[in-house]
Regions:
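Single conserved hydrophobic/aromatic residue that forms the stacking wall/gate
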Residues: 263, 270-274
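Pyridoxal 5′-phosphate
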Residues: 1-266
Length: 274
């Protein structure tokens, strides 16, 4: 929105269906020769929705010359991602969602695109030659990394990547999928619990929930007394909550450090009865 305001751009949003999957027909109707960028989430951080990325990339490329940006913050920690196979142009990843430290992430992009772009910030280590009247930039990626880098965070993120690689992302994905099925079966049996999830096998292990008559923050605090960590709020998707007529939800996400969500579901059931 800030870029759109600065450069007089028009932003359009893709609808979702009743199962919270992207409406592909609506996407097709939005594309034109004027479309410059298409950006979608690889996995929804609220409904767990997993779009068919390759299909969507093919549709976008057939109808426009737009660059395709994949938000992989929720996807990359849970599943193996092959950027070459997907055919995307850029991939954005958040470090803290994949066992890394806060304050650091990764933006992968095709090299020819990086080479064609100018630096956003100026500072040390991003220059090649400096003269009184001009400067030349260092090769990618250095020209985009001005100043002292967050080397402590980078080392931490590297260790997290090595850790997950040693486990194998296929193993991580299988564990996440098994947690999803277990959690789905448990949560569906709790009366009064509204589950915002596609409830299909083509989804991640992310469950946003609400209980009628109880605020998400209160539920979160109650679950905390059981030692259960969930997040309460709008999870960076206020328009989505507004569409569902919800002020907030509480969200549980299974990961490699979870063995099951039995305690979480039982605690939510007790909170519902309270």
């Amino acid at each position: 929105q800030m870029a759109a305001e600065k450069y007089n751009l028009n932003i359009k949003f893709i609808n979702v269906d009743e199962s919270f999957n992207l409406d592909i027909d609506h996407l097709k109707s939005l594309l034109s020769s004027k479309t410059k960028i298409v950006s979608i989430v690889g996995e929804s951080n609220i409904s767990g929705m997993l779009p068919d990325i390759k299909e969507i990339v093919a549709i976008v490329k057939s109808k426009s010359d737009a660059l395709f940006i994949l938000d992989g913050a929720q996807l990359v920690p849970h599943r193996s991602v092959d950027v070459q196979d997907l055919g995307i142009d850029f991939l954005c990843v958040s470090g803290h969602k994949m066992l890394g430290p806060t304050g650091i992430g990764v933006v992968w992009g095709r090299k020819e695109l990086w080479d064609s772009m100018d630096p956003v910030y100026g500072g040390g280590d991003m220059i090649e030659e400096v003269y009184y009247d001009k400067a030349t930039w260092a090769p990618v990626p250095h020209k985009f990394e001005a100043g002292t880098p967050p080397f402590v965070e980078a080392i931490g993120l590297g260790a997290a990547v090595d850790y997950l690689t040693n486990i194998s992302m296929n193993e991580v994905q299988q564990h996440s999928d098994s947690l999803r099925e277990y959690a789905k079966n448990k949560l569906e049996n709790i009366d009064g619990l509204n589950i915002i999830h596609s409830l299909s096998k083509n989804a991640g292990c992310t469950f946003a929930m609400s209980i009628e008559g109880a605020h998400a923050t209160d539920v979160s605090l109650m679950l905390d007394t059981y030692g259960v960590a969930v997040r309460a709020g709008h999870h960076c998707v206020q328009p989505f909550h507004r569409k569902l007529n919800l002020d907030a939800t509480f969200r549980a996400t299974g990961y490699i450090y979870n063995d099951c969500l039995l305690y979480t579901s039982d605690a939510a059931d007790e909170e519902d009865s309270v």
